[in-house]
Amino acid sequence: MKIFKKNEYDAKDIITFTFNKGTVLKGSEKRQAEVMKNGKNPGLGIRELHKKGITGKGINVAIIDQNLLLHHPEFDGKIAKYYDTGCEQDPNSGSMHAPAVTSILVGNKIGVAPDAKVYFAAAPSWKGDSEYYAKGLYWIIEENKKLPEGEKIRVVSVSAAPSGKGSPFTKNLKMWDEAVLAAQGDGILVLDCRNTETTGIIAPAFYNPEKPDNISMCKGGFPTSKYVVPSTQIGVPTSYRTVAEEYREGSPSYQYTGQGGLSWGIPYATGVLALGWQVNPALDKDQMVQILFKTCSTANDGSNIINPAAFIDAVKKTKK
C-alpha cells in the first residue's frame, strides 16, 4: 500500500494520476474513489447501447497480449480459450497489460462489448521476438477454422507493434507481417499499433472526464501531448480510464490511468466493432471498417473520433 499525505500531492491533479486500489491519497479519499468509479465508464454513449441490448452477445473476438489470470470479476468466464505462446511465467502471476486490455474489451463494468467471448493468446512482449505474436495469431487462425459459420472470430486486438517503423521488437518482425496477411486472407480483421493502412487505423484520443459521452469535446492524442487525429485514422478514448488489475491469482483489483497509451484504444475499437457484428453478422471486415470510418465525428479540435451510436445506426441500415 502507498500512502500519500496531503502535502505530497495537489488534489486538483488527481484526475491526471495513475493509481490503484492500494493507493491512499490522504484527505481526498472520496474524490479518489469518484475518479476511479468514473473511469470505468467507456463513454461516447456505449452504456446507452448496452441498455438497448447491444453488448457484443454471440460475437467471438481475440486478443494477443501478455500472460493473463482468467478469473478477474470483470471477465471471469469470458475467455473461450487461452493459449500461452511461451511466456514462461508463474501460472499464479499475471501482468499489468493483459487484464487492462481484456477489461476494456469485455469487462462487465468497464468493457465496450461485455457479452463478447475472447480467444486469448499470451505472448511475452518483453522478449522482443515477434515470433511469439505470429505464433499466437496462427493459433487464432486455426481455432477459427474449427468454428462453425456464424461463430467465427471476427477481429484480433493487438496492443503492440510487432513490426514496422519504430517497432520495439528486434527479432522475426517479418513473421508478424506474414501472420497478419494469413489472418486477413481468412477474413479476420487485425488491429495493432503499427502505422499501416489496414491494421494501424486507431489513434489515441481522450474524452472530457466530466462529460465522457460528449464526442465533440474529445481531443486527439494525450492530455499532455495533444494532436489532431487525421481522417485516415480513428481517435479512440485511451485516457482517464479505470482498468482491471491482477498480479497474483485471487487478488483482483483496479487501476486508474490518468493517461493511457494507444494500447487502451485498440481493445476499445475492437469492442465497438463487436457491437456492430452483433447487429449485422453478415458484414465482412472491410465493410465494417468502412462504416466505422464513415460514421466518425469531427471533434471541436478537428480530430476524427469514433462515434459508436452513429456506427450502430449505420450498421442497422445495412440490414434493410
Where do the PLM segments sit?
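C-terminal subdomain of the subtilisin-like protease fold in secreted/lumenal serine endopeptidases
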Residues: 149-160, 278-320
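Extracellular/periplasmic catalytic domains that process cell-envelope and extracellular macromolecules
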Residues: 53-57, 111-114, 148-152, 183-185, ...
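Subtilisin-like peptidase catalytic core
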Residues: 59, 66, 79, 85-168, ...
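Catalytic-core regions built around general acid/base machinery
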Residues: 171-191
